[in-house]
Design a protein with these regions (language model features):
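Flexible, surface-exposed loop regions and adjacent strand-edge segments
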Residues: 27, 128-130, 194, 254
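Extended low-complexity, serine/threonine- and proline-enriched intrinsically disordered segments
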Residues: 170-199
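His/acidic metal-ligating clusters that form di-metal
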Residues: 1-69, 98
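Residue-level detector of high-confidence beta-strand sites
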Residues: 57-59, 185, 248
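A short, sequence-level motif marking secondary-structure junctions
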Residues: 114-117, 189-193, 252-255
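Aromatic sugar-binding surface patches on proteins
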Residues: 193-226
């Protein structure tokens, strides 16, 4: 018998929970009820799952004892890789893995990418992204087939900075500063532009047809802000719930955008 005070981790292939729209993805609610009853002695159960090839932390208010880490793929998205494809997951996360440790009952998870070790984000100068979108012929094909997908070539994205922070956990704060002045940051669910041009556009070049599963693409850990200028550097700071600085880097603008973007 496992003592009720122990830290419990449950590993599954498919996510037990998913995002706000789909909640349980492939799992029937009755199965979650069974798991909840099975672990009723434990105050907290950490779920580790895969399948989705993306990085996502989820909780469900109906099942407060569980939290879940949807893990990225070590291959990125190997099923659709091509010669021009970086090792990326569909949400733009760099391919990698999570190292979990427990100290005094407290769980800690660290993301490790294959190529860049502890890299936790990618920042985009949306002026450069917009220029790419406006001038690429395959983007025009995509706009025709998928009018509801993000069109980063539009004026509304001018001077914006996007930060895909796949290390995000609840309580983390993403702050952006332009020449020392803070910018208003919002969390969005917009798709990752690098994954789009690396995977979706080459696929359209091969077979320009509509696929229902590609009609809506999101990244759950994307943050956006509009800068005051087009060229000033933007400092990125990430802190945890206690205000401890976790990461700091500077986005130098203009920053080139193409399939080799880092």
């Amino acid at each position: 018998t496992v003592d009720a005070s122990k830290t419990v981790c449950l590993c599954t292939h498919c996510p037990v929970f998913f995002d706000r729209d789909r909640r349980t993805l492939l799992t029937d609610r009755s199965q979650v009820d069974s798991l909840d009853a099975l672990f009723s002695r434990f105050e907290r159960v950490h779920i580790f799952s895969g399948h989705a090839h993306r990085t996502l932390y989820t909780q469900d208010a109906d099942y407060p004892r569980f939290d879940q880490y949807v893990l990225p793929a070590t291959s990125g998205d190997m099923w659709v890789a091509n010669n021009d494809f970086q090792a990326l997951c569909p949400d733009g996360s760099d391919a990698g893995f999570v190292v979990a440790s427990v100290d005094g009952g407290k769980l800690r998870c660290d993301y490790r990418t294959h190529l860049y070790d502890r890299k936790v984000l990618r920042a985009y100068d949306m002026n450069a992204v917009g220029e790419y979108y406006r001038n690429d012929s395959l983007v025009r094909v995509q706009r025709r087939l998928y009018p509801d997908r993000a069109d980063y070539g539009r004026e509304e994205y001018a001077n914006c900075v996007y930060v895909n922070y796949w290390g995000y956990l609840p309580g983390h704060r993403v702050e952006l500063f332009e020449e020392g002045r803070s910018l208003e940051v919002v969390q969005v669910e917009d798709e990752d532009p690098l994954y789009n041009i690396s995977h979706y556009l080459p696929e359209l070049a091969r077979k320009p047809v509509f696929k229902k599963g590609d009609a809506r693409v999101v990244s759950h850990h994307m943050f956006a802000a509009r800068a005051r200028t087009a060229t000033a550097p933007v400092e990125i700071r990430i802190t945890d719930a206690d205000g401890v600085l976790l990461h700091r880097e500077t986005l130098e603008r203009p920053k080139k955008f193409d399939k080799e973007a880092r």
